[in-house]
Amino acid sequence: MNLTDWLGYIESTHPSTIDLTLERIRIVLERLNLNVSFPIISVGGTNGKGSTCSILESIYKEAGYKVACYTSPHFLHFNERIKIQGVAVSDGLICEAFSKIESAREEVTLTYFEYGTIAAMIIFSEADVDVAVLEVGLGGRLDAVNVFDADCAVVTTVDLDHMDYLGHTREAIGFEKAGIIKPSSAILGIVCKMPAIPKTEPDNFLFRAIKIPKGTPIMIARNKDKPTATKY
């Protein structure tokens, strides 16, 4: 099948377009025995995820690293979602990755986004990249991207979005988005821009409901203010 055929096929394999869970993707990844040895930066938040990914991609590229970037949605071509060194990967590489996923998944159905996420990581692993920047699709805690532990987690903004899936308060939505932060993360980078949150609200309101080790480094940036480094 060509890429157009594959995309039509993967749209039909799962009954729901959005079905937040990590169970299915974990099963398929275990069967693929995918080895992810490069550092991962996961970028979540309500707005600004795509631009943040682009900035990080450019920084790493200019610094001489072989950088991979996975974003969504695409504008014209699916390939735009999966880039290495700022260049969209070929149809052939994506089709090869889809074929491997199809052979491994057996009875497990995957969403369109789950297929794309696994395909991206297969391609990045085989390309031996130095670092990968991954944009969260929806929320964070149960998003397919979050099956890969982030070495650095970036949360851009927290606002009321996708409330049917994430909750009806900023605290509930913040909990879901902050789910990309792992206790094992070597570096934690947080960019907070929450003008609707009262000024008396502590910067760490996102982290109240999740277990972050004391002493974890956090970078706080409020609007255009100079970022400040602190520890949780």
Model-predicted regions and their roles:
Residues 188-232:
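Short, strongly patterned local motifs
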